């Protein structure tokens, strides 16, 4: 069972997964013009990005699927699945259309040497954008969450 903690409460502080900042890593050359491994990190954020934004804007939806309301746990579950990687219209943003009940979109922003999670939300149909790759979370996620079927 993964352990989630925070480095602090400021908007640029991080959620940690088992003591590390990376929730997943997109390997080098998976995306156009990205030649280095790119970790995916969840920052505390504010009203516009990160766990604070996700709780404020999508909290009711989140609690239906993550009853304790822990954004870090839910994001980790989503990043342990697979989906399409899309380039979105906004500069420096990447969309991951990930599938795990519920279907969702996870939006990343390129910060330079890592991707910061901007938001995650319910998205029944596909995102608008150019498909540039496939995200394979069960291979790339840090300590992948494995859904147990009953």
Task: Put a short name on every predicted segment.
Residues 1-150:
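Ribonuclease/tRNase effector modules and their secretory precursors
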């Amino acid at each position: 069972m993964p352990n989630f903690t925070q480095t602090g409460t400021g908007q640029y502080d991080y959620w940690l997964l088992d003591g590390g900042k990376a929730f997943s890593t997109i390997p080098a050359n998976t995306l156009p013009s990205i030649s280095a491994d790119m970790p995916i990190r969840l920052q505390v954020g504010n009203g516009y990005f990160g766990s604070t934004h996700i709780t404020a804007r999508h909290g009711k939806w989140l609690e239906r699927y993550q009853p304790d309301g822990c954004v870090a746990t839910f994001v980790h579950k989503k990043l342990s699945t697979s989906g399409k990687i899309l380039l979105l219209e906004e500069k420096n943003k990447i969309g991951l259309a990930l599938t795990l009940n519920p279907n969702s979109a996870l939006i990343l922003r390129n910060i330079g040497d890592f991707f910061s999670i901007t938001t995650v939300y319910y998205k029944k149909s596909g995102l608008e954008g150019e498909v540039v790759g496939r995200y394979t979370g069960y291979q790339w996620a840090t300590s992948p969450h494995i859904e147990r079927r009953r």
